[in-house]
Amino acid sequence: MPFARVNGVVLHHETRGRPDRPALVFSNSLGTDFRIWNAVVDRLQDRFHIILYDKRGHGLSEATPPPYALADHVSDLTALLDHLGIARAAVVGLSVGGMIAQGFAALHPHRVAALVLSNTAPKIGTEAMWNERIAAVTERGIAAIADAVLERWFTRAFRSPDNPDYVGYRAMLTRTPVEGYAGTCAAVRDADLTESTRALKLPVLCIGGDHDGSTPPDLVRSMAKMIHKAEFRIIENTGHVPCIERPDAVADLIGIFLKDAQYG
C-alpha cells in the first residue's frame, strides 16, 4: 500500500487508471476513507489518471493530535500532489473534501483545471454544532453519534440493517480515529471560504443530493450562484454521500462536465 510522509504527516494514497491521461483527484468526506469513491472511479478510470487519498486522521493515514485547520488539509493535499509529481489536476471533493478542494483551488488556481464540489459549501454548520459534536465523540466515541450522522448521509431505503453496504459504511464511520474525526470537525468549524470561493474563476460543477441532511440542496445551490458560471445539479434519491448511493449518476455528471470543460 502506498504511504508517503508529506507536510509532517503520513498519508495513505493510491493511483488508478491511466498515468498518460489527465489527473483527477478525489477528496473524501468526514468519517470516511477513499473507498467511498470506488464505484465512481471504476466508471472513470479509462479516461483519467486517478489519485485517491485518505486525509489526515482518516482511513490508513496518520492521525496527528487535534485540532486541525482546513489549511492543514489543503497543505497535505498540495504536498501529496508534489510528491506524486502532479502539476495540474481536476479535483472532486465531497463535504469537507469539497472545502479542501475549494481551499486548494483558491491557493493554487494554476494547478486546478476544474472543480467538482459535491454536497459541500464554503461554510458548513455553526460553531456550537461542531463544538457539541467534538465533545460527544471525545467523551463517548463516534459510535454514540453514528445513527444521527448516518440519517443525514443516506436515504431511509439505504439505511437498512439488511443492507450489507449500509453495515459496512457504518463500520467505516465508527472506526475512524477519534483524533482525526474531532480534529477535522474543528477544521470545518473554523473555516469560512465564502470570499475566496466567490472569487474562483474556473469550471465548477456543484452537486447536491435531494435527501442530504448535512448540506441540503439549497445550501449547495447558494454556493453555485456565488461562483462565476458554476453549474448546479441535483441527484435524486440520495443523501449526503451520492458517490455511494448513486455512483452511476455521480460518474456521469463528472464525465460530462469534464468533457465540456475540455479536460480528459
PLM features: what roles do these ranges have?
Residues G125-A128, E139-R198:
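Conserved alpha/beta-hydrolase catalytic His-Asp/Glu region
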Residues N38-Q45, I51-V92, D252, I256:
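Active-site loop/oxyanion-hole signature of alpha/beta-hydrolase fold enzymes
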Residues N28-L30, A89, G93-S95, G209:
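Conserved alpha/beta-hydrolase "nucleophile elbow" surrounding the catalytic nucleophile
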Residues M99-L107, R111-A146:
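Flexible "cap/lid" loop of the alpha/beta hydrolase fold
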Residues D210-T215:
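Acidic catalytic loop of the alpha/beta-hydrolase fold
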Residues L200, C206-G208:
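Short beta-strand/loop motif that positions the catalytic acidic residue
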Residues V9-A63:
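Conserved HGGG/HGGXW glycine-rich cap/lid loop of the alpha/beta-hydrolase fold
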Residues A230-G264:
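Catalytic active-site module of serine/aspartate enzymes centered on a nucleophile-bearing elbow/loop
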